[in-house]
């Protein structure tokens, strides 16, 4: 889908103005109430009071979540006019703006409209700028139009309606986002950034949604190489022998039961000078998690293909950073393998030595994400990072604590935590800061090693983060537990692309 911006003089709306633009659909937002303003007022004037009459007669009141499609409206160059309800202006929030975009996309998807002049961006919430509105519009429109089976048609020959794949996709191909003339430059940059973030989210969703017999550790490694080739990044992929040479005993313990070879992926984006310390993103890449010898229940186990969504989001984010051309250095690190049971798999009670030299009693083989991450967190010390953020579908306990709205955020540094929280709010990819008190560390005590890999049922997400914190003493570190936000179940089943928006916004803010 192609996005662009068009700077318009809203005072010139008539025969030679923006309302004369030839397009398949003109999208206009209306606040609830009879006081028309901005584009809505200009449209009302050009159509000789049509909008006002619709409002007065109660045919369209501008209530949030409502829309009205008009056809062949006199005085307008568009074949269709879509009125979108914005709700009460006093209550117009980020979420209300997002709801308006989604409402418009749903309405357009039921038509054959291939192009649209989108006049919602200048009606962003009061606290947001045009760049936010443009980026948000692009990511939401692309999110709504995402279809895995269009991108990987070999997975399924027909869609839910029995038609060949692609027959149910939206016709929309070109969206021109209208902005004020004074915001043209910022809006143009926002199109580049919004498109890059949307591309990163789609890559993340693809990798998460693909079945584990396709998206193997080797597939992830090849994907990383492809990103590097397209965007001129530096890629390094370590195999089992190199991982063994690094003494990554915790990572290797997880790999023992699988015949799929483990991979350790490093991608480098050098957008700033060599003297600038990089931001390192570490993503958990368990491409399928059976639980190992501590076997998971069969029900819902198919969703354990999503256990590599941390890795997917890290790859999606560094691709977005490269496409945006941000002036900072970013490194993505992905330890990836399967967690499988077998005759040689790691057993509960086994003790292993991590790359850091600390020993770990593996009390539960289903607490494997922290094992592959701890060696990766030790490995990244060599980069002397400005900050390290690890991303993982780490604990079911985080879902119990936070549900599916907020990702769990852990950090020792208030400054790093606040920057991530602020980025999440702006990107509408929110997180909630969780405790990391030293008192929780006692739950990880082991009689036979420096620590156990689990801390019991109480505060399970917290103790998992405490475990990781023991390997991050040499740099500023944050942990995102995305177990509740990386994918959805049920009718809307699929990867969400989170937390790419949060991470991308954090890096954009840092590069500013």
From Swiss-Prot:
Residues annotated to bind Mn(2+) 1: 289, 366, 368
GO cellular component, one term: cytoplasm
Pfam families: Peptidase_M17, Peptidase_M17_N
Enzyme's top EC category: hydrolase
Residues binding Mn(2+) 2, per UniProt: 284, 289, 307, 368
Superkingdom assignment: Bacteria
MF terms (GO), sorted A to Z: manganese ion binding; metalloaminopeptidase activity
Biological source species: Cupriavidus necator (strain ATCC 17699 / DSM 428 / KCTC 22496 / NCIMB 10442 / H16 / Stanier 337)
Official protein name in the record: Probable cytosol aminopeptidase
Main location: cytoplasm
Comment on bound cofactor: Binds 2 manganese ions per subunit.
Catalytic activity of the protein: Release of an N-terminal amino acid, Xaa-|-Yaa-, in which Xaa is preferably Leu, but may be other amino acids including Pro although not Arg or Lys, and Yaa may be Pro. Amino acid amides and methyl esters are also readily hydrolyzed, but rates on arylamides are exceedingly low; Release of an N-terminal amino acid, preferentially leucine, but not glutamic or aspartic acids
GO aspect biological process, one term: proteolysis
CDD domains per UniProt: Peptidase_M17 (cd00433)
Cofactor(s) needed for function: Mn(2+)
The family this protein is said to belong to: Belongs to the peptidase M17 family.
Keyword vocabulary terms for this entry: Aminopeptidase, Cytoplasm, Hydrolase, Manganese, Metal-binding, Protease
Enzyme Commission code(s) on record: 3.4.11.1, 3.4.11.10
Role according to the record: Presumably involved in the processing and regular turnover of intracellular proteins. Catalyzes the removal of unsubstituted N-terminal amino acids from various peptides.
Active-site residues, Swiss-Prot/TrEMBL: 296, 370
Gene transcribed to yield this protein: pepA
Compartments (UniProt record): Cytoplasm
SUPFAM superfamilies the record matches: Macro domain-like, Zn-dependent exopeptidases
